[in-house]
Design a protein with these regions (language model features):
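Extended, aromatic/histidine-rich regions of cofactor-dependent oxidoreductases associated
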Residues: 1-178
Length: 178
């Protein structure tokens, strides 16, 4: 039997928690490899991933800030910080998995005739990024990552509210020893 209802529990298990279930997926970045310690003068590899939402992805960025550099309270999303672009890693070369020849069937939407994405990274996918931090002096740092979407909007905007999809700017601590 088919039951028609407008009872909110039918499709909204978060209704009582005041979540916005109609928000589009946001573009955001998270760390994957984040070293806790390193030595002064040594390059520091840092990697992460991006979730590509409805706004697409223009770039992933990283920022390293000395812990004793107190950031102004009137810039809670670090819009004036000296962010550096990370490298978005290329898409996989084989998308077909266990399909014959490891190839996608013809005419898969958003893929070209060679089985590669027409645009990378694609919306509603995950992609990886990497960067190498160089020339870091001895000290303690906060390292943050964020995304910029195809509209030029930086994470966590345009909707920084937790109930509309959590996409805070992630941070980790890095100690650089002498």
């Amino acid at each position: 039997s088919v039951v028609l209802t407008n009872n909110y529990q039918a499709n909204d298990t978060y209704a009582d928690a005041n979540n916005d279930i109609d928000s589009w997926m946001k573009t955001m970045s998270r760390f994957h490899f984040k070293p806790a310690k390193t030595k002064a003068g040594e390059p520091v590899p840092v990697t992460g991933w991006v979730q590509v939402g409805v706004g697409g992805l223009s770039k992933a960025q990283i920022w390293i800030n000395p812990k004793d550099n107190v950031w102004p309270e009137d810039d809670p999303y670090f819009t004036k910080a000296p962010w550096q672009d990370a490298t978005i890693l290329p898409p996989p070369t084989r998308w077909g998995g266990d399909l014959p020849g490891g190839r996608l069937p013809p005419n898969v939407r958003f893929f070209d005739e060679n089985g590669q994405p027409k645009h990378w990274p694609m919306r509603y996918t995950l992609a990886h990024w990497a960067t190498l931090l160089k020339g870091i002096a001895r000290g303690s740092y906060d390292v943050r990552c964020r995304t910029i979407d195809l509209n030029g909007i930086a994470q966590p905007m345009p909707r920084p509210f937790r109930k509309s999809g959590r996409n805070t700017i992630q941070r980790f601590s890095l100690t650089v020893e002498g």
